[in-house]
Structure formats: C-alpha cells, structure tokens
C-alpha cells in the first residue's frame, strides 16, 4: 500500500480492498462520508485493475435497444440521499450474488433521457468530485459487477478520462469520433477495446 495513505482515515479500508475483502454497510457509510477522494480513487483503481487490468471498453452511438444484456443504473445527486444510494447499491450487490445476471453498472448524475445527442461538455447539477466519488464507491462496493460504465455526454470528455482512474472501465456516448475516444483512453494510460452490445470486445 502506498505510504501516501498511511495517515488516511480510510487506511484500514484500503488494506481490506487490497486483500480482496468485501466491505460492509458500516464501511460503506465511511466511504460516503469521506472527502478523501484520492483514497477512494486508489481503492476503486485496485478493484478496476483486478477485474479488467488496463482494458477500457467503449461503444460510440449505441442504439437504445442494442443489447439483451442486463445493465443496472443509479441516479445520484442532490435529490437522492446518501443512505438511499447505499441501499440501492447493497440491494444490487445482493441480487447479483443471487443471479449473476448483471453485466455493468452506471452511476448517473441525471436521467439518461436528458443526455444531449451531440453534447460532450457534461450536464447535471453535481460537481466533478461528486461524480468521481460516485464512480469510485460504486466500483468498490459492487465487487461482483464486471464493469462500471460512464457516459461522456454526462461527464464531459475530460472528467470521463479522469474517471478511468476512479473505477470506470467502460465508456459510452455519442457525438465523438472513434479516434478521439481511443486517444482519450490511451492518454489515460489504458488500452482501448471496442465492445459489442453484450459488454465484450468485438
């Protein structure tokens, strides 16, 4: 574990994540209440690379009905309490334990129907820190989900690129060229993999 986090109040949780231990509700509350975004990021990145290495899947201009795979979502922000978010995440984790049917999870800062088809600057009322925190905590707690997905139409290209260090390994959106998406992923030190509608590579 990096010595940088030796004095972090989340040090013990970083240790648990490194050891592959599942975090309980009390630990999740601590994550939600923490402002240590770097500690959250290191835990999420450990989980991300354990599951997917440096691979980052992407899909451009996906049709609304492009897949039969199961994807879960959660709206976060001012209209949803922290406890409601945690309840949602733990219910999903339990359901995934039982069924194993979900392919990916997408934390959303606003309703998907509000996404601009050609916008790449991000919309919504959350801050960048809140967005990264939502991505990281989702990755840390949903240890039985293979993919955490983000949309550059919601986050904007720059924050989407940063999210690749905070647990995200699957990108989607519209209004951007394939070359630009690949470049964004590669400049974040990741490997770009175009995916099909089922969450796998083409």
Explain the meaning of each model-derived region.
Residues 63-98, 116-129:
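Conserved non-cysteine loop/helix-boundary elements of the Radical SAM core domain that shape
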Residues 42-71, 158:
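N-terminal pre-triad scaffold of radical SAM enzymes
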Residues 25, 54, 70-71, 88, ...:
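Histidine (H) residue identity feature
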Residues 1-42, 46-51, 97-202:
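Auxiliary Fe-S-binding modules of radical SAM enzymes
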Residues 59-61, 71-75, 105-108, 149-151:
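A cross-family glycoside hydrolase active-site/sugar-binding cleft signature
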């Amino acid at each position: 574990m990096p010595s940088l986090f030796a004095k972090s109040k989340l040090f013990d949780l970083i240790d648990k994540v490194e050891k592959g231990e599942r975090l309980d509700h009390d630990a999740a509350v601590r994550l939600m209440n923490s402002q240590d975004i770097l500690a959250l990021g290191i835990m999420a990145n450990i989980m991300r690379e354990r599951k997917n290495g440096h691979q980052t899947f992407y899909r451009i201009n996906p049709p609304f009905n492009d897949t039969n795979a199961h994807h879960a979502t959660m709206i976060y922000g001012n209209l949803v309490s922290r406890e409601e978010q945690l309840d949602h995440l733990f219910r999903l984790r339990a359901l995934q334990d039982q069924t194993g049917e979900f392919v990916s999870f997408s934390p959303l800062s606003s309703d998907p129907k509000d996404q601009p088809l050609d916008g790449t600057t991000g919309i919504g009322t959350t801050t960048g820190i809140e967005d990264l925190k939502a991505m990281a905590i989702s990755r840390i707690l949903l240890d039985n989900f293979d993919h955490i997905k983000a949309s550059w139409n919601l986050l904007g290209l720059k924050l989407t690129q940063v999210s690749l260090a905070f647990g995200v390994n699957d990108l989607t959106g519209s209004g951007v060229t394939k070359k630009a998406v690949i470049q964004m992923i590669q400049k974040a030190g990741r490997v770009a993999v175009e995916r099909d509608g089922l969450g796998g590579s083409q």
